[in-house]
């Protein structure tokens, strides 16, 4: 055995390719790529010698395909954007939502969302619709917001005719059977229960702050169906609403990944001259109200000590959201407000961080990093065709609510102060990056095309938006923030509110120079 090992060793050490000794990591061939354990002399900001310079893609937002818009004889707009790939996203967007329910039972849009893609004149059941889409690898979805209802399908582009025909049938010819309405009633009830039980209060707080900001008008109306209205919904109520708001002049058929001429042909075939299930006739009860910002406070006292969904206990928190009126997405100040919102940023105290998480935004640097007891501080910007709302959501222990409110009001006041050039450029870069990254997804492009054409009858291209973002100056941020601070605040509060300051004190803090709440003197603590 020893002789065999010795012979093999001699063979490997002999001549030929097998006998060549391999270079070791200590050899000069490797040593020139290594620092040898010492700190490298080349800084990370300098390119490595001998390495070719990489060519990066430019962030100009230029798209290879043009957004085309055609208006049919009945007023319906057809918008398309071609895109590489064999799949497409097609849908119908409608100027319909909770803001238009002033003359109707609140919650109709919420019910229609649950009834979407149910049985129609051509399809006997939801299963038949799904089987039809399955033949083209398709999926469907319906979403409602305060001002828009969207029916969408993603499928193989070869099935475009089938998809548009299906969408037209779903939107204009739903059966709305008693059984389907009862199923939708159960789904709405479950969603309302879930909304009140979930540990994350953000959807509920958003609902409350809109109610406070726009008292009983337009976008301040309930987005979710109130519990007392769930049992009142029937086919007649739904048809009365559909007759006035599901009209061609309030619709856009949008498609991404399709040829425009083919989409227009399908629209003429299925959406021109058709009689909807609720009959024809002029829309007479259409709400064209303009949003009236009122400001105010909405409070909901609730025991938040046991909201954990599992065995791990969740800390008892009080949540507040303070908002001020900003501007509509049609105004020139919309872009500065978007940059301001990105500059504020924020998040939760347990965020893992990482690239793009906004760890250098103001709400992280000034709030979460300095106050360990703050569980959340996040900025949100809601914008509509006639108004907007910039909010900060914060969460903390109920005993520190007053201090938390003062920290938030101070951050609002600081918005109108000095804006550092570095933080502004970082916010602009992050906003541009987020915009371009989101627009890589076909469904997002579809929604962008549809919403813009629905609101403005045209589409502002990404490179135009990038140019507007780059043009934002520190004085623009200071100007829009100063204008915003002159308005009344909208306040939403949820949880143990025993330490919540009075609304007048919050308003006084936002009107002060330093954002501090008025001092409260108590004889007994």
Swiss-Prot record:
InterPro entries reported in the protein's UniProt record: Metalloenz_LuxS/M16 (IPR011249), MPP/UQCRC_Complex (IPR050361), Pept_M16_N (IPR011765), Pept_M16_Zn_BS (IPR001431), Peptidase_M16_C (IPR007863)
Coarse class of the protein's main subcellular location: mitochondrion
Taxonomy, superkingdom: Eukaryota
Residues modified to N6-succinyllysine: 64
Subcellular location: Mitochondrion matrix; Mitochondrion inner membrane
GO CC aspect terms: mitochondrial inner membrane; mitochondrial matrix; mitochondrion
Signal sequence, start to end: none
Presequence extent in this chain: 1-33
Family matches, as Pfam families: Peptidase_M16 (PF00675), Peptidase_M16_C (PF05193)
Keyword annotations from UniProtKB, A to Z: Acetylation, Membrane, Mitochondrion, Mitochondrion inner membrane, Transit peptide
Coiled-coil blocks: none
Modified sites of kind N6-acetyllysine: 299
GO molecular function terms noted in the UniProt entry: metal ion binding; metalloendopeptidase activity
One GO process term, biological-process aspect: protein processing involved in protein targeting to mitochondrion
Disulfide bonds: none
Protein family (similarity comment): Belongs to the peptidase M16 family.
Subunit field text: Heterodimer of PMPCA (alpha) and PMPCB (beta) subunits, forming the mitochondrial processing protease (MPP) in which PMPCA is involved in substrate recognition and binding and PMPCB is the catalytic subunit.
Function: Substrate recognition and binding subunit of the essential mitochondrial processing protease (MPP), which cleaves the mitochondrial sequence off newly imported precursors proteins.
Protein name: Mitochondrial-processing peptidase subunit alpha
Protein source organism: Bos taurus (Bovine)
Gene: PMPCA
